[in-house]
Design a protein with these regions (language model features):
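Core SAM-dependent methyltransferase catalytic element
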Residues: 163, 173-193
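Short glycine-dipeptide loop
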Residues: 42-43, 66-68, 137-143
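Conserved beta-strand signature within the Rossmann-like core of class I S-adenosyl-L-methionine
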Residues: 140-152
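A short acidic, Gly/Pro-enriched loop at the edge of an enzyme's catalytic core
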Residues: 44, 105-114
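Class I SAM-dependent transferase core
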Residues: 1-47, 55, 82-85, 116
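A short glycine-rich, Lys/Arg-flanked "PGG" loop and its adjoining helix->strand segment in the class I
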Residues: 61-62, 127-142
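Class I SAM-dependent methyltransferase SAM/SAH-binding core
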Residues: 47-105
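A short SAM/SAH-binding and catalytic strip from SAM-dependent methyltransferases
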Residues: 112-126
């Protein structure tokens, strides 16, 4: 299948990953509410796509407990090394770091919930990524996208673009939220059509 034309994206962050663990981020992004909406509960399988520092990975791993699994997917080998070190330090045995491809998360098993947290604007071939992700979703799985309004090049992307691309990849919009008071951040929830 020919690769779709690449859309404009932001340059992926390559600096110190610990900046993503800023104080107050849990409250600002309402991450417990996000996990509630995505149905992340004990025993579930979750994918953190574009895991970066593992900020969400760690929170999801604690939520799903020992009977659940979190796949921490990133295309940056340094991020995977960072996450691997972090989960050892935090003694989390339910996290599986995965070095994915730009258009395929390479998930080894079906997942119940997925979150792309401030990642979607960096995906050059989002429709292909979502199609590959779709094949790894359990029945009733939810896919969440948290991002900022923008044009793709400024570490943000218009929510209408995300909705259109997800629709083209075989997803339907289930819910949408504006959690952050700045009017820029949004949270979209999709399911398979």
């Amino acid at each position: 299948m020919p690769q779709a034309e690449q859309r404009k994206t932001s340059t992926p962050y390559t600096g110190d990953l610990s900046i993503f663990d800023s104080p107050g981020r849990d409250e600002r992004l309402q991450i417990n509410r996000v996990m509630d909406i995505l149905g992340i509960t004990p025993g579930k399988a979750v994918a953190d796509i574009g895991a970066g520092s593992g900020w969400f990975t760690v929170r999801a791993a604690k939520r799903v407990g020992d009977s659940g699994t979190v796949y921490a997917v990133d295309i940056n080998p340094e991020a995977i090394q960072y996450i691997d070190s972090r989960i050892r330090k935090e003694n989390l045995h339910n996290v599986k770091p995965i070095l994915g491809k730009p258009d395929d998360p390479l998930l080894p098993a079906a997942v119940d919930a997925v979150l792309l947290l401030k990642t979607y604007h960096e995906v050059a071939h989002p429709i292909q990524l979502l199609r590959n992700l779709r094949a790894s979703l359990a029945e009733g799985a939810k896919v969440g996208v948290i991002d900022r309004e923008g044009n793709g090049e400024n570490h943000g992307i218009a929510r209408e673009v995300v909705i259109r691309e997800a629709n083209e990849a075989g997803f339907q919009l289930l819910e949408k939220y504006d959690f952050v008071k700045d009017g820029m951040d949004y949270f979209l929830v999709f399911t398979k059509k």
